[in-house]
Amino acid sequence: MKREQLIQNIEKLKHIMPSYVLEYYQSKLTIPYSLNTLYEYLKEYERFFSWLVDSGVADVDKITDVSLSVLENLTKRDLESFILYLRERPRLNTRSTRYGVSQTTINRTLSALSSLYKYLTEEVENEDGEPYFYRNVMKKVQTKKKSETLASRAENIKGKLFLGDETQGFLDYIDNEYEKTLSNRARSSFFKNKERDLAIIALILASGIRLSEAVNVDLRDLNLITMVVEVTRKGGKRDAVPYAPFAKTYFERYLEVRSQRYKTTAKDTAFFVTLYRDVPSRIDPSSVEKLVAKYSQAFKVRVTPHKLRHTLATRLYAQTNSQVLVSNQLGHASTQVTDLYTHIINEEQKNALDNL
């Protein structure tokens, strides 16, 4: 979704929200939460507050009028009814989802509500320096995580990683072979953004940064001499992330054409830009997702930018055998999330031994 459209959608949702949700939104902007995250949270709040009104839990006619006391006095049973509503309503009212929304969707909804409740019961201050209320019913609700072993996750993901020579092979394919699959019209469009697209993909493959971190990189953030890119991690923390040398040439090629092709000036600080009606702007995450999907599907298998991040992490662990180093590279506080990469590498080593 384009940034302009995203902002418009957010404004529409803000218009129907209670005042305390708007306070929450403003507070999270200062951290900062990304606009995409806040948009997803606002959509969850719209669904929740609509249920409060429609079910009669809140004795009001509009979402805007749902008071703080409704949230304060919401019971565990009320929330369980809401969860059942999420599970059952799609089955009753649509043909596309036979068994209701997924557990992942429910967990996302509850996560958004937990964030709002934490703000209202712990973070916000009224005139007396106290939170709006203290009772947090979300602490009584358990979420069910998807049950999957590391072996299963590794098996599902390893076919979508560009390991070994495939990392450079993927970039070479985009650079030299992809155009041969296109019509003359499509080829012209491809050439307009070829250097930029290669630079974006190379950055993620060489550093493992998140999609949101990549699109928010500014010109001043990327150092071609030290081969370090500065990013804003989750929670608003700044981090200096080294990137692999193979990406440098793609950055240089993109910078050679950036100002002329995208008509940028000194005020256009975003590293990755797009041009619409002769006006340059920062590229948005959905555009990157689409271009990664397009190129990867033509090369081998359709993947997401997050799979490119997994690719870097797996390759880095294969070279270092250090979960701490991989965790630092990815911006994780714990090494627990890197267990997956050790399992993938163990499987790759086993397969290599089998072929001896």
Swiss-Prot record:
Record domain Core-binding (CB): where: 16-121
Location, primary (coarse class): cytoplasm
Residue span(s) of domain Tyr recombinase: 169-354
Cited InterPro entries: CB, DNA_brk_join_enz, Integrase-like_cat_sf, Integrase_catalytic, Integrase_recombinase_N, Integrase_SAM-like_N, Recomb_XerS, Tyrosine_recombinase_XerCD
Keywords noted in UniProt: Cell cycle, Cell division, Chromosome partition, Cytoplasm, DNA integration, DNA recombination, DNA-binding
Recorded GO CC terms: cytoplasm
Keyword Cell cycle: yes
UniProt similarity note: Belongs to the 'phage' integrase family. XerS subfamily.
Known role: Site-specific tyrosine recombinase, which acts by catalyzing the cutting and rejoining of the recombining DNA molecules. Essential to convert dimers of the bacterial chromosome into monomers to permit their segregation at cell division.
Protein name according to UniProt: Tyrosine recombinase XerS
